[in-house]
Design a protein with these regions (language model features):
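A polyanion-binding, active-site-adjacent surface
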Residues: 3-269
């Protein structure tokens, strides 16, 4: 059954096939599909950021993740029953020549997996984009869906795992397979990057790992994650920030000022 997109009104099935008019869908009907880790290694080997995004959004290399993301897209949360679900891997998004990279964990099952854009359509994203707007890095404080007019200024967001995982916990094998997309995307934008904000310990580990694999020297002993933690890797400053999950924001472990402070430091790096 096809349902109307909340912004454009165009109707889509769930999951959304590529090249059918979803806002900002980078893939075409001819975009090659990865069915294995070896395929990911081969298809991530491109010098085009747009093509990398396209290829990553049709990836089917991890059977458990494919099954889960599509199961959620078909079943839908009751509050979103009238909307189509993207139900595919979620690409990096934002400025193509970013000053700041924001690295998270994975799309939320009913957030990015529904909207097709990282940190969009869930409480974590509400918190994150409000902060980016307050410090002058986003043109609006809200993110509801792809095509909603949101723009980032000098910022790009990437999830180390591009599919929504069951219980928000990817396996080591899934993480390692998806790291090939991550590594290439970081390589393609690294020349302009001066700060990386890692949202949570998983993101901190992923950030240090991909920067190291892209030629930057990771300090020894390896820097530990903490809110406000800072590590210098060549021309890049890595900053730690608690993940803006409800577990952290509802309890006061992460406040608006704490979040804003990290993004101000990243902005000024």
């Amino acid at each position: 059954m096809s349902l109307p997109h909340p912004v454009t009104g165009a109707k889509f099935p769930s999951p959304v096939p590529p090249h059918t008019g979803w806002p900002d869908d980078p893939a075409t009907s001819d975009t090659p599909v990865a069915h294995s880790r070896d395929d990911v290694v081969r298809l991530a080997d491109t010098e085009s950021l747009a093509e990398l995004s396209a290829r990553s959004t049709v990836c089917r290399a991890c059977p458990r993740l494919v099954e889960w993301r599509e199961q959620v897209a078909v079943g839908k949360r009751a509050s979103f029953a009238g909307q189509p679900y993207w139900g595919r891997p979620v690409p990096g998004w934002g400025d193509d020549r970013p000053h700041i990279l924001i690295i998270g964990l994975a799309p939320a099952a009913n957030g990015g997996n529904r909207t097709g854009r990282i940190f969009t359509g869930d409480r974590s994203g509400d918190w994150l984009f409000a902060s980016l707007h307050r410090v002058g890095l986003a043109n609006q404080p809200t993110a509801t869906h792809a095509g909603d007019g949101l723009r980032l200024d000098g910022v790009r967001m990437i999830a180390p795992v591009r599919c929504a995982p069951p219980e928000n916990k990817p396996t080591p094998e899934e993480r390692d397979t998806c790291s090939k997309w991550l590594d290439r995307e970081v390589r393609l934008v690294l020349g302009s990057v001066r700060a990386v904000v890692a949202l949570g310990s998983f993101a901190w580990t992923a950030a240090l790992g991909t920067l190291g694999r892209n030629g930057l020297v990771v300090p020894r002993p390896r820097p530990k994650f903490g809110h406000g933690a800072e590590a210098e890797l060549g021309h890049v400053t890595v900053l730690g920030c608690y993940h803006p999950s409800q577990q952290n924001t509802f309890t006061g472990k992460l406040t608006e000022e704490m979040t804003d402070d990290v993004f101000r430091r990243a902005r000024d790096a």
